[in-house]
């Protein structure tokens, strides 16, 4: 696992990377108190998350998954068991163990940190992005130089187009983009950069985008048959 620490004035912002699934996890705190939240944790790294939190003297109060992941088992439930944090997902989530379901445009608060939920279906029908000041956590909806596949978990290329072009790409151009995955060593981007340079976004219509996405012919994620039911039921790997 790799992790990167950014201190923005008082704010604590850590980006951790799971090399097996190429998943980014984010640990965030305002720094003005001791409360923290985590976005998109991977179960294998639960001990590392706890270690980071303890080293920074932070208390985990909320943990968020942007959607039901198909390429890894979430650490959301293990973190809940070990810290009693609140498990958060969008209201469309199929998860059976969520403590707090967030509606589109609803806000999540952890001390002085505020995230606004944006319903961004397409990769899955339960995908949400989260806007925090100058940055947006896009899950698998908008990637760096790519977009999330739309061929499983009730995904829809047409819905993805609407989420991208009518929601995310309408954010201010200098908004930082932090996705749930990257496969080329990139840590973040901006809305302007993705709008101008992302090859998946250089289309002239919803139909053209759907034509591209519906003909990718990708293999299913290796962990899909394990990860999806585990993430819906709230299971840990040792319970499968």
Positions of PLM-derived features:
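Conserved beta-strand hairpin/beta-sheet module of binuclear metal-dependent hydrolase folds
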Residues: 10-59, 129-139, 145
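Active-site HxH/HxHxD metal-binding segment of metal-dependent hydrolases
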Residues: 22, 33-35, 43-119, 196-200
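Ser/Thr-glycine-rich phosphate-binding loops at phosphate-binding pockets of nucleotides
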Residues: 61-67, 120, 138-139, 180, ...
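Accessory terminal helices/loops
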Residues: 162-176, 180-238
